[in-house]
Amino acid sequence: RQYPDILYGNMIKVDADGRVIGKSREVEYSLRQYYSATMNHDCCYIRRSLFEKYGYYDELLKIVSDWKWFLQAIGLGDVRPVYADIDVTLFDTNGISETNLDLRNAERRQVLEEVMPSAILADYDKHAFDMEQMSRLRRHKWAYRLTWFVERCLFKFEKWRRK
């Protein structure tokens, strides 16, 4: 029987009072996804051989050491995580990774500049906002259809104008 390299489940987010405020879901992980988001290590089961291939978490980083590892293994590597719809862990949203966003963002930027080719990073920097907007629009069918319609109208208008 073949087991996945990374198996991940649900992470339940809880606030300071222990109330459930959210739950992770299955996500299609890609380099674009890792540019601004991550897979949480605490709801993952990772095959040991991956640490031998990609190294261990970078302990010089205070917040994003797991993010860096996943970026290298999944975003830039060939590892494909497999999702199981089971609750694995509770995540306290009052920890340093959720409350010290300035440090988290600075560390992420440091990692991106370290591991991504500069030309690719420049493209991501240039188009990150547009990609995030399109991702948000796709979650709302009516907004996505409206955007598609406007884009088609602009295409026809520009084509007509060139004549």
Where are these regions (language model features)?
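A short coil-to-beta-strand element that immediately follows conserved catalytic motifs
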Residues: 5-7, 82-84, 121-123
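Context-gated lysine
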Residues: 13, 23, 53, 62, ...
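Conserved nucleotide-sugar donor-binding catalytic segment
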Residues: 9, 16, 21-111
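Glycine-rich phosphate-binding loop signature in dinucleotide/nucleotide-binding domains
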Residues: 1-2, 54
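TPR/TPR-like (Sel1-like) alpha-helical repeat modules
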Residues: 112-116
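A short, conserved acidic/glycine-rich loop-to-beta-strand motif
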Residues: 2-12
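Membrane-proximal basic amphipathic "stem/tether" segments
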Residues: 117-118, 123-163
